[in-house]
């Protein structure tokens, strides 16, 4: 678990340490975290930073396990208060996030995200409960149990980015749904590959 930053001076190092602590406080778990601050100590004294680049592995954010994230911020406004620098104002993040299909399955069956798994089962399969989710190369497989029948229904889907969110489309029908999405997040690309979900997008972050 390492934090790295541009070694342009003690002010940037102090800010890098503060940002690292803030990022970890926003996550349930962080395995590896690397930061690079783009700017100069002079800019920082004026309360400005050009951008921050972030690379993280094995992160759990709001109950969602992320294998890998590579993000870059827009310009940042920083208040150099005594002891610990503080970010001012909202800022933008853009970049890529990768999740393993097996991890996504566990998340959607967890208490925190069960509502979304069951919503998918209801919207896409007409059944109240999601049994499992599997990513088979570039295909999404959903399974839902049939109540009182001792059996399960399985359906295959593809996904893509649409209207700022993720659209899931039935392979054998015209049915499709768009995931409910935080208005501060815009998904620009969504694809399945090698048992993993890859997302690219932009998010507005409030410190």
Task: Identify what each model region corresponds to.
Residues 56, 141-147:
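Short beta-strand segments that buttress and anchor functional surface loops
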Residues 24-33, 124-127, 180-184:
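Short secondary-structure junctions
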Residues 150-182:
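Short, hydrophobic/π-rich interface segment
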Residues 130-135, 157-160, 188-190:
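Short, exposed beta-strand/loop patches in secreted or surface proteins that constitute
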Residues 172, 176-207:
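Extended terminal
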Residues 24-103, 205:
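N-terminal beta-strand/beta-hairpin edge segment
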Residues 1-31, 39-42:
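Hydrophobic, proline/glycine-rich low-complexity stretches
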Residues 83-143:
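Surface-exposed beta-loop interaction hotspot
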């Amino acid at each position: 678990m390492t934090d790295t930053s541009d070694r342009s001076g003690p002010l940037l190092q102090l800010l890098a340490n503060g940002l690292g602590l803030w990022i970890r406080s926003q996550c349930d778990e962080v395995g590896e975290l690397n930061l690079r601050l783009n700017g100069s100590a002079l800019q920082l004294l004026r309360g400005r930073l050009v951008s921050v680049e972030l690379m993280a592995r094995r992160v759990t954010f709001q109950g969602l396990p992320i294998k890998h994230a590579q993000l870059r911020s827009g310009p940042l406004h920083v208040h150099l208060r005594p002891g610990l620098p503080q970010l001012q104002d909202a800022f933008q993040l853009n970049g890529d996030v990768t999740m393993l299909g097996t991890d996504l399955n566990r998340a959607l069956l967890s208490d925190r995200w069960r509502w979304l798994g069951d919503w998918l089962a209801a919207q896409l399969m007409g059944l109240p409960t999601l049994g499992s989710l599997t990513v088979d190369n570039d295909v999404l497989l959903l399974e839902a149990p049939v109540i009182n029948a001792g059996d399960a229904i399985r359906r295959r889907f593809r996904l893509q980015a649409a209207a700022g969110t993720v659209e899931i489309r039935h392979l054998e029908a015209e049915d499709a749904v768009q995931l409910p999405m935080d208005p501060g997040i815009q998904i620009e690309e969504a694809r399945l590959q090698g048992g993993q979900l890859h997302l690219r997008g932009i998010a507005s972050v409030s410190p």
